[in-house]
C-alpha cells in the first residue's frame, strides 16, 4: 500500500481532558441548631449557626418581621419601658382588649396608635403583671396581679376594679394567679405556700393558704402554678403543677383542697433551678413545657420517668442544651423571661432577658422539634393574643412580632429593614475525609416569592469565619391587575432561584456559611459545591 503524505497543518487528535472538579450537595439544615454533637461527626442536616431562619421539613425559611403597633408612653419627654403586655378575650370579639403596663399605669393599646390610660397609679413596684381569664355566671373576667398593686379584675361590664381590699387574706405581695378546678389560686412573693379562693366560681371572698414547703426539698419558695390536662395512663384529668424556684415540681390531683380525701400529692420531681422572674413555662400540645437549667422540660416525660437530671438527652432542647443552660444560669434573676407558642409561624419561642444590649430568642419548630435562634427582635415583655405576637420595647412602644416583611417598621410605615438570615451548615468531608479539597464554587438554591440576595463563603478546618459584609435586598414589588404593563409587569409567585458564587477555600472539611435577605417565606433548600480533590498532604 503506497504511503500517503500527511496533510499540512493538520492538528493531531487529542484525548479528552479528564474531569478534575467534583460536585457535591449540601442539604438544608432542617435538623436545626446542634450544639450537642462533635463538630467532626455532625449530621449534615444540622447547623452550627441558624439565625432568623426557621427549620422546616423541606428547608429553612426566613422569619417574618416586626413593626411598631402603639406609640411610646412618655413622661416629661422620656420614654417609659413597656414591662408587661396582656389581653382580655371578651364573649364578643368587638370587646376584646390589648393592655400594656408602664410607669405604674395600665394602658389600652387595642386600637394601636396613641395609648389610652386605663388605670392610673396601680401601685405596682415593677409593672410585672401576671394574668389569666375566668368566667363566672355573672361575667367574663381578666384576673391580674402584680407585687405592690395587688389583685385586680377587668370585664367589659365593670372595667378595671381593684379587688385587693375586698378579698379576705389578700395582700399586695400577690405575685401570680391561675385557675384550677373552678377555683382561683394565687402565689405570694417569697412564700412557700399557695393560696386559693374558698368558693368555686368566685373572684372575691376569702383566700386560704395551703402549705407547700414539704415539697420544696431544695429550698426556695413557690414560683408559679399551672394547670396540666393529661390522661396519665388512666383517665383524662386536670392536674395542679406547683413549681418551686429551686426546681422542685409537685403534681396534685383532686378537686377540693380543703379535704385530704379529695386532694392528694401524686409526686415530686426535680427539673433544676428555674428563672425567678417572668413566665418561663407554657402549655403546648397537651403538655407543660418548663424552662430550667436542665433545658426545656416537658411534664409528660418528667411524670413518666423519661426525663431526669441524669438523662437530659431526651428533652426537646437537648441539641441546644450546652449553650442554653449557661444562659439560664447567668440570666436567671433577670426580668422578662417569656415562653410562648406563635401558631402562625409554627414555633415555640423562648425569649431571654436582654443581656447588655443583646436581645435573643430560641425558637423550636413545633412540628419537627428543630431549633434556630432569632436576633433583631427587641422583645422585652410579650404575649400571644388572637394567635398574633405582641411585645413591648424599652423605648415605650408596643409592637407586633413575626408579622410583616420588615424588621423595625415605624408606626407611620417608614424605616425598617429586611430580615437578615444567617446559616453555617455542618462540616462535611464529602466522602473523602483524608483528602485535601479546593472549594471553588457554590450554588445555593432558594424557593420563595422573589429572588433573595445572598453572600457566602466556605469555611474549612472547623473555622467560623463570617461572610464579608451583609447582602442588600430591594423588594421587586408586584404589579396590580389592570394597571401593570403587559410583558413588563412583575407578578410575585413562589419560584426557585439559584446562582453560582466563588469561594476559593482549601481544606479537608468544608462548611457553607451564608447570609441572606429577602421576603418572608423565602426558603434555603440546598447547595451544590464544586471542588477539586487533592492528596492527603
Q: What is each residue range found by the language model?
A:
Residues 2-114, 122-138, 271-287, 293-537:
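Beta-sheet repeat architectures centered on beta-propellers
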Residues 69-77, 115-122, 160-167, 210-216, ...:
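A short beta-strand motif characteristic of beta-propeller blades
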Residues 101-102, 146-147, 188-189, 244-245, ...:
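Structural signature of WD-repeat beta-propellers
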Residues 113-117, 158-162, 202-208, 257-266, ...:
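Beta-strand initiation motifs
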Residues 156-180:
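Asp-box/WD-like beta-propeller blade repeats and closely related beta-sheet repeat scaffolds
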Residues 177-223, 228-234:
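Solenoidal tandem-repeat scaffolds enriched in leucines and small polar residues
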Residues 200, 246-248, 361-365:
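Beta-propeller blade signature
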Residues 238, 242-271:
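Surface-exposed extracellular loop regions of Gram-negative outer-membrane beta-barrel proteins
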